[in-house]
Structure formats: structure tokens, C-alpha cells
């Protein structure tokens, strides 16, 4: 009887571990706005660690926010963010908005639902490009599990209101550049 219980416990533990397996993928996005067309819905649902290179825009960030329910780690350190203007970006309620190049879009990983800002709860770590100029309004607001934001830029990008609000996030910057971040507005 004990052997049977032990076997059942072992099988349950093994199936639980399999269900939470890390799924890492790397994609080169040649045309901004086409990330989601490069994979199936099942793939997007299972990815936990995603590395993107190539060209992204606000449409891609909306898909990252809304259609990758298991995403924990995002590396866009070798991606370029292109300009986008339109209603299919990250701004709440489908408002027309102009997203500038190499800016982490406003509401990139948060959304306003019923007047309340909700962040991407699964996101734990993000690695940003050295080309990043701005982290826009509420980009990571409400991402309560975001523990690490690694920025490869030696000079601090502009940090707009509530960009990192509601999260206790460790910011990792290149060696010798901590003063650039420490003395820049909103980075204190």
C-alpha cells in the first residue's frame, strides 16, 4: 500500500514539474509588428523565456503584454524599437498614439481595465537594449513580480511618470555608469 502511495506521489510530482517547464525561444523579427505571426497560439502560450532581435514596434509590445500568458523573462537587448503611430499599440482603449523609436512604449506591460492599471503579473525579468532612450508612462506599472530590469545603456534613459511604479525592481546597469542613473530625474 505504501509503495502504491509513493508511486502515485512520485507521478504527481513529476507531472507538476513537467507542467512548469521552462520554454525558451529566440526570434528574429525582420518587420516591425509581425512578431505574433511568427508562432502558433500554443507556442505563445507556453513561452516563459523570450529573446527577441530585429525590429519591434508598439504592436509587438501589445502582443507581448496580452498574448504571452507565461512570459517571465524578456530579452530585447539586441532589438531595435521602431516608430509606430496608430490605434493597435499599447495605449489603453485603442487610443491613437505616436510611439517614438527606441522608446519602451507607454503601457508596454500594463493596461487600464475598469479604471485600474493592471501590470503583467508573470513578468520577472527584462533586459533592455543600449539603444533605449525612454521608458514611457506606466510601461511597467503594476508588474508586481518584476524583480530585475537590466539596462545595457551607459547613460540613463529618460524615465517617465510611473514607468516602474508599484514594483520593487533591482536595476542592473553597466559597470561605471551608476552615477549617470543616480543623478538623472526619477531614477533616485
Whereabouts are the PLM-identified features?
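Bacterial Sec-dependent N-terminal signal peptides
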Residues: 1-24
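Accessory end-domains appended to solenoid repeat scaffolds used in host defense
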Residues: 38, 46, 57-62
